[in-house]
């Protein structure tokens, strides 16, 4: 095992080096955001508690300005993204748990196809921003709704 594997500190070494290098070159005028996985949803995989520890480390030790939380979807080997039958906001509970561990803004994503659900996430303080990926492609007017 090298200096980047094994312990939590070792696994966080590479992200810390990358973030420090970006901050050194960009200065404080650029917000640094990190996208992390909220949970793996598989036995032995990363849990929301693990992700909360990573999020806290990225904020406190690396100085990130915000976090973008996604969620691995490994329901089947052939499924690497949320199937159309999964409800919008399927990561909301995990996002909420991780948000409690940090003070930086949290961006969430996850099949938000109806604007009211995205608005609810922000209104309830469960996230600070909701990102629309595929939905923006399918419906470019989504932000105007």
Language-model features, listed with the residues they occupy:
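Flavin-dependent oxidoreductase catalytic cores
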Residues: 1-145
